[in-house]
Regions:
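Helix N-cap/capping motif at the beta->alpha junctions
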Residues: 10, 28-41, 63
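Charged docking surfaces used in two-component/phosphorelay signaling
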Residues: 14-21
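Short amphipathic alpha-helix used as the core "switch/output" element in two-component signaling
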Residues: 37, 41, 64-82
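Active-site beta3 strand of CheY-like receiver
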Residues: 43-53
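Receiver (REC) domain active-site loop signature in two-component systems and cognate sites
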Residues: 58
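Alpha4 helix (beta4-alpha4-beta5 surface) of REC/receiver domains from two-component response regulators
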Residues: 83, 94-109, 122
């Protein structure tokens, strides 16, 4: 599995990479702009990401803008919805407004912080990313 993570907090990045790296290659970006750029490069190389983990509150470009950029790249390339990357929002913003916005923009699962490894792994199983 190929994983892209956009997270500006060092401790969270280290934690997430620590448990996600056992499932596959994990690329890390620190803002939404880098995430969209990395996603585009992966598509151009013919090696798209299977899973994208996006924080919402990040510098340069927030997670919502990054999610829109990622979904637009997939749409522009004619990638069918069932073949698109699974996007899990990983954020401390757990209020109804933010959850609703993320799903409207195309996230697959919303996972509030602090991240619970077991729940996160269950979400990945539900998405068919791991056994």
């Amino acid at each position: 599995m190929k994983i892209l993570m956009a997270e500006d907090d060092f401790v969270t990045r280290k934690f997430m990479v620590g448990f996600l790296s056992k499932y596959g290659e994990c690329d890390v970006t620190v803002d939404g702009m880098e995430a969209v750029d990395a996603f585009m490069m992966a598509l151009e190389d013919g090696e798209p990401y299977d899973l994208v983990c996006l924080d919402i509150m990040m510098p340069v470009m927030d997670g919502y803008q990054a999610l829109m950029g990622i979904r637009n790249l997939e749409k522009d390339r004619g990638i069918p919805e069932d073949k698109r990357a699974k996007v899990i929002m990983t954020t401390a913003l757990n209020d109804e407004k933010n959850v609703k916005m993320a799903f409207e923009l195309g996230c697959t699962i919303y996972s509030g912080k602090p991240i619970d490894k077991e729940r996160f792994e269950q979400a990945m199983k539900k998405l068919g990313l791991i056994q």
